[in-house]
């Protein structure tokens, strides 16, 4: 063929095709059944419309509805159908943007009267009608002038702004489904009929145009869409369970923390919540000691000159909290900022004193308080805050030590997650983005090392740990590993990171003396296990639904009396429990025992020891455990021994068994 392309299929076979053949034609040439199932195709990982010509050689895949990548297409197409339905029902409504998000999509609308959930049934009915029409998605490329004229005639002023924001060298793509069309980069499935009916509108919210509070407020409609009804129902069940486990609700019930208007995005920790926080810190501190980390503490407030050197002032200034010294009338004009990250401070500590290659690796760890501005609408309990604590560490090592240090970090991260009950973990390697610092040779070297480490992680786990590569998703200063854990109801949370940094050591002139007596730049590795410790605690609260294992519970035991005649004995029991290292309190109130048990169960106390006149006489306790109706009567000494053993932390249990 004169204009042919060479395609490599997933089975490794290679065939030549006419470059003008479309993805649909390719699927048809393979089999009619595949052509019926196809919703898109991909060349070299880039998903394309079935109507697109092949155009170039590469690895090809036909995407069907059961492919994970089809979900994004289903959701994208459903967003377009939502927009068409709204404009059919309420002519004059302006459409703005409608992206795919995790587990669904949203679309922002400009309308004098905001939408409410009461509008959902009629919108969903209209959406089903549009899907049933099975109109093909067609694509055209318009000139900038034509696009602006058409959308201006339609009164779509927000689309005009979007057109102006598109770089001149990029095509303006218009996707139509029947008579309705929208400005869109694509790709889309072949027709609206391929969407199916496994979708649901979820909620409405206000959203400023372009996220700027100076712009008009729009109405955002959120929705979800899935490949089939079973997936949709499973998702709805998960949401119901997530609502029951909401850490904000459990935080109130367990008296752990609260938020208030005077401190948006910062946590007011109550005694029990702070105890839980300290339990996590103490556990992490012991794990770091095992691994040879040095715990340090860098200043909270630093001059902007340091942030300029680090690059944060240029890259991150809008998210930093700035302060001046001693008010406006001081003669000191220096500008300071609360630290958004711990890393520049750790470089200063590494630089303090001459380092030899024999001193490496140097591992500096900090439970560092950092502050980052988040829009008020983005704040969400412990999960999204403005002030939080990072379990941050930075390893300064030689290039030869990089692989072994990454593996040590990996082992620490995985064992930590296992101790907290997370055993479904995936590790993603994010590689070089388009905008980056460092030479291609340095990136090649680092990515080769981390790719080898990733393969070792996979094989050592017997393929239990899922690994993948995120092309172009690395930070501007180096490639990174992202650790994603799955919780009890199937949600995924990205927590841990291991990140190579080419940037900061060079910017700050950090060096060590090599074996040849020459100055050498160390490799710097950023490492976090929890990430934000507040967020990690929120994840733990929801994962356990407040039913913490005894070793981690902020309140382990309550001794509740049936009668005032047992008050003295209950006080003695609490004293002995505390002497054994358990967190225990007495409930001597003049209330019925069922009321006490119900109240402490709501507060998620793992163990309630009930004491009455008989228990006092026999030196026994009646044990009731959270979530169980069973009762067990044991002698006091035996009960204390049993609970003390159960409360041993996993790391101490391992050390004891070694």
Curated annotation (Swiss-Prot):
The record's annotation in InterPro entries points to: aa-tRNA-synt_IIb, aa-tRNA-synth_II, aa-tRNA-synth_II/BPL/LPL, Anticodon-bd, Anticodon-bd_dom_sf, Beta-grasp_dom_sf, TGS, TGS-like
The terms under GO molecular function for this entry are:
ATP binding; metal ion binding; threonine-tRNA ligase activity; tRNA binding
The cofactor note from the UniProt entry for this protein is: Binds 1 zinc ion per subunit.
Under the heading PROSITE patterns, the entry gives:
AA_TRNA_LIGASE_II, TGS
Where's it found, cell-wise?
A: Cytoplasm
One Gene Ontology cellular component term attached to this UniProt record is:
cytosol
Give a GO biological-process term.
threonyl-tRNA aminoacylation
Q: Which Pfam families does the UniProt entry name for this protein? A: HGTP_anticodon, TGS, tRNA-synt_2b, tRNA_SAD
Enumerate the cofactors the protein uses.
Zn(2+)
Kindly state which keywords UniProt assigns to this record, in alphabetical order.
Aminoacyl-tRNA synthetase, ATP-binding, Cytoplasm, Ligase, Metal-binding, Nucleotide-binding, Protein biosynthesis, RNA-binding, tRNA-binding, Zinc
Q: Which domain of life is it from?
A: Bacteria
Q: What class of enzyme is it?
A: ligase
User: Coiled-coil ranges per the record?
Assistant: none
- Protein residues bound to Zn(2+): 343, 394, 526
Q: Where is the TGS domain?
A: 1-64
Q: What is its EC number?
A: 6.1.1.3
Q: Where is this region: Catalytic?
A: 246-549
Catalyses: tRNA(Thr) + L-threonine + ATP = L-threonyl-tRNA(Thr) + AMP + diphosphate + H(+)
Record text on subunit structure and interactions: Homodimer.
Q: Would you identify the family this protein belongs to, as annotated? A: Belongs to the class-II aminoacyl-tRNA synthetase family.
This chain's function reads: Catalyzes the attachment of threonine to tRNA(Thr) in a two-step reaction: L-threonine is first activated by ATP to form Thr-AMP and then transferred to the acceptor end of tRNA(Thr). Also edits incorrectly charged L-seryl-tRNA(Thr).
Which protein are we looking at?
Threonine--tRNA ligase
Supply the gene name.
thrS
């Amino acid at each position: 063929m004169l204009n042919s392309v060479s395609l490599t299929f997933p089975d490794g076979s290679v065939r030549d095709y006419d470059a003008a053949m479309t993805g649909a034609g390719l699927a048809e040439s393979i089999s009619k059944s595949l052509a019926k199932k196809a919703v898109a195709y991909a060349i070299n990982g880039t998903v394309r419309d079935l109507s697109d010509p092949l155009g170039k050689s590469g690895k090809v895949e036909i995407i069907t509805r059961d492919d994970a990548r089809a979900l994004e297409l289903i959701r994208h197409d459903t967003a377009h159908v939502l927009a068409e339905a709204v404009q059919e029902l309420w002519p004059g409504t302006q459409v703005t943007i409608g992206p795919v998000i995790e587990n669904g999509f949203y679309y922002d609308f400009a309308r004098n009267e905001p939408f409410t959930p009461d509008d959902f049934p009629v919108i969903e009915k209209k959406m089903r009608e549009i899907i049933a029409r099975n109109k093909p998605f067609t694509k055209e490329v318009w000139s900038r002038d034509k696009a602006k004229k058409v959308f201006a005639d339609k009164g779509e002023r927000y689309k005009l702004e979007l057109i102006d924001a598109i770089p001149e060298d990029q095509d303006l793509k218009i996707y139509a489904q029947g008579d309705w069309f929208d400005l869109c980069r694509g790709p889309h499935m072949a027709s609206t009929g391929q969407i199916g009916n496994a979708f649901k509108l979820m909620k409405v919210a206000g959203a400023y145009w372009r996220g700027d509070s100076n712009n008009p407020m729009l109405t955002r409609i959120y929705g979800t869409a899935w490949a089939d009804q079973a997936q949709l129902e499973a998702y709805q069940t998960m949401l119901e369970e997530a609502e029951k486990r909401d850490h904000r609700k459990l935080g109130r019930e367990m008296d752990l923390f609260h938020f208030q208007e005077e401190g948006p995005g910062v946590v007011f920790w109550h005694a029990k919540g702070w105890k839980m926080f300290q339990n996590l810190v103490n556990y992490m501190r012991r794990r770091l000691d095992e691994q040879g980390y040095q715990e340090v503490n860098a200043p909270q407030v630093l001059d902007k000159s340091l942030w300029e050197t680090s690059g944060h002032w240029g890259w991150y200034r809008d998210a930093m909290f700035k302060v001046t010294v001693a008010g406006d009338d001081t003669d000191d004009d220096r500008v300071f900022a609360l630290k958004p990250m711990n890393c520049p401070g750790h470089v200063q500590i590494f630089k303090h004193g001459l380092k030899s290659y024999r001193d490496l690796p140097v591992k500096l760890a900090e439970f560092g308080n950092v502050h980052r501005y988040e829009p008020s609408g983005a704040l969400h309990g412990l999960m999204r805050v403005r002030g939080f604590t990072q379990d941050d560490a930075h390893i300064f090592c030689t290039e030869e030590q990089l692989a072994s240090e990454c593996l040590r970090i990996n082992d620490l991260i995985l064992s930590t997650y296992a101790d907290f009950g997370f055993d479904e973990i995936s590790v993603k390697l994010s590689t070089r983005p388009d905008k980056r610092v460092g030479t291609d040779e340095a990136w090649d070297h680092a990515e080769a090392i981390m790719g080898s480490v990733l393969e070792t992680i996979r094989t050592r786990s017997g393929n239990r740990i899922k690994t993948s590569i995120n092309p172009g998703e690395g930070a501007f200063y180096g490639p990174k590993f992202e650790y994603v854990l799955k919780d009890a109801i199937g949600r995924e949370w990205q927590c841990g990171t291991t990140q190579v940094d080419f940037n900061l050591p060079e910017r700050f002139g950090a060096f060590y003396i090599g074996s040849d007596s020459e100055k050498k730049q160390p490799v710097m590795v950023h490492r976090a296990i929890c990430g934000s410790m507040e967020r990690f605690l929120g994840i733990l609260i929801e994962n356990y639904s407040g039913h913490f294992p005894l070793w981690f519970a902020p309140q382990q035991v309550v001794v509740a009396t049936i009668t005032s005649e047992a008050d003295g004995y209950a006080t003695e029991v609490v004293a002995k429990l505390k002497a054994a290292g358990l967190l225990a309190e007495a409930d001597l109130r003049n209330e019925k025992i069922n009321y006490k048990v119900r109240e402490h169960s709501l507060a998620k106390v793992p163990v309630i020891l009930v004491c009455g006149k008989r228990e006092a006489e026999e030196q026994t306790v009646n044990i009731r455990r959270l979530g169980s109706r069973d009762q067990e009567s044991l002698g006091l000494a035996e009960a204390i021994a049993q609970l003390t053993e159960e409360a041993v932390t996993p790391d101490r249990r391992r050390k004891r068994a070694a």
